[in-house]
Amino acid sequence: MRIMGLDLGEKRIGIAFSDPMGWTAQGHSILQRKGLKKDLSYLQELCQEFQVEKIVLGLPLNMNGTMGPKALETQEFARALQEALKIPVDFWDERLSSKSAERVLLEADLSRKRRKELIDKIAAVHILQAYLDGGSLGKDY
């Protein structure tokens, strides 16, 4: 089963895909956000191209596990995504995924500009790989 992983941001969406067996996550691209309709249209094209059967969306919970404004916005995006694409959407706790991605990029000794370009894609990989390794949060959020 091919799964798409997304790291949703205000300006960009990091995109990753699993291999066809659903074992490993690979970074794909970064979508510069251009409005909900255009974002959904692009993601739909990718889902068709890669024959995606499920989408995993990083859920930005607060450090104490509660949901703040960003998590609520993510849920709204997930509802729109599932309605438009007719593909199940699951959540994964993304706390510290961007920090983890930044650490990887720092260790790779990339420039600040290059790190900024890649961080969302790497965060999407971290979210998706964690999901593949550990199961899902389900629909409780």
From Swiss-Prot:
A single cellular component GO annotation: cytosol
Alphabetic keyword roster: Cytoplasm, Hydrolase, Nuclease, Ribosome biogenesis
Enzyme class: hydrolase
GO molecular function: nuclease activity
GO terms for biological process, alphabetical: rRNA 5'-end processing
UniProt-listed Enzyme Commission number(s): 3.1.-.-
Tagged with keyword Nuclease: yes
Signal peptide range: none
Subcellular compartments: Cytoplasm
Matching HAMAP family: Nuclease_YqgF
Family named by the database record: Belongs to the YqgF nuclease family.
PANTHER family according to UniProt: POLYNUCLEOTIDYL TRANSFERASE, RIBONUCLEASE H-LIKE SUPERFAMILY PROTEIN
UniProt function note: Could be a nuclease involved in processing of the 5'-end of pre-16S rRNA.
Protein name, per record: Putative pre-16S rRNA nuclease
Higher taxonomy: Bacteria, Bacillati, Bacillota, Clostridia, Eubacteriales
